[in-house]
Amino acid sequence: MNIGIVNDLPLAVEAMRRAIARRPEHRVLWVATDGAQAVELCAAQPPDVVLMDLIMPKFDGIEATRRIMRSERPCAILIVTSCIGANAWRVFEAMGAGALDAVDTPRLGDGAAGDTTKLLLAKIDQIGRLLDAPGGTRLAGTAARAGGGPLIAIGASAGGPGALASILGGLPADFSAPIVIVQHVDRAFAEGMAQWLDGQTPLAVRVAREGDRPQPGVALLAATDDHLRITRAGTLEYTREPAATPYRPSVDVFFNSLTEHWPGRVIGVLLTGMGRDGAIGLKALRMKGYHTIAQDEATSAVYGMPKAAATLGAARAILPLGRIAGELAALARI
């Protein structure tokens, strides 16, 4: 893959160069030392993936990510910055603007076997699989049983944190439907993202744990690199299968499990994101007679997943982000 590096620290740039050089299939296409230069280079020489720092001159990595993803030639962006934990709120803002993931900057003396070098290369490989993926998982075929209350099932990827904050923040405090969210996010950030989202809404937001049951007025966030499913008993479980999918956790896997096992109504929502994950699952939900919503192009940070859903006819409604919370509140009262 062709890789762009955006970082104003020479030692950090050199550490990333050395890590990338260990993979003959990767090469550094260019290096930008500030956000403005990164935007210009992405337009002139689009790379396959950008390794974006957060704190830089002129404008920071969040603003650079936002401008790149809104441009005519958006690029896949991986946040690579020092001390991810201390910069968690910046990471979530960047992911809300369209970044796919985040990882600590590799250490210069790490060597080939160093943890930070291996983790960076693993993240780059994961993004490569995402870019190459044809998308989709197999449709489930078992009918859902009648009865029970509505479950709000939301899938999101790049740009998702900001979209989720907007929707959850727009729901009333007495919103009584259970919510389950599958966001493409590394398990290292899931707990922090749940806490961050919890501060954006009057509802309770926490990570989904094995054996949890969806609770009225509570939003549960998938929290591991495994897939989340609903079981026949109505509890949540994590599973490694299907192992081949590049999306972990997969929105399709969760949506399809609802068509098999959820006993009541489902309202499926597919938000901004790169690729096609969730489109086939949303189609399966609609074919079962459930209400389905996809975010529109104008308000999506990355119009990939909702576009795939629209192409398949999976969405009963295609809505701007600002209208989705109101639609959910109205549908949950029916």
UniProtKB/Swiss-Prot annotation:
Residues 145-334 form the CheB-type methylesterase domain. Keywords: Chemotaxis, Cytoplasm, Hydrolase, Phosphoprotein. Its EC number is 3.1.1.61, 3.5.1.44. It comes from Burkholderia lata (strain ATCC 17760 / DSM 23089 / LMG 22485 / NCIMB 9086 / R18194 / 383). It is an enzyme of class 3 (hydrolase). NCBIfam families: PRK12555.1 (NF009206). This is Protein-glutamate methylesterase/protein-glutamine glutaminase 1. The modification 4-aspartylphosphate is found at D53. It catalyses: [protein]-L-glutamate 5-O-methyl ester + H2O = L-glutamyl-[protein] + methanol + H(+); L-glutaminyl-[protein] + H2O = L-glutamyl-[protein] + NH4(+). The keyword Phosphoprotein applies. The active site is at S157, H184, D277. The gene is cheB1.
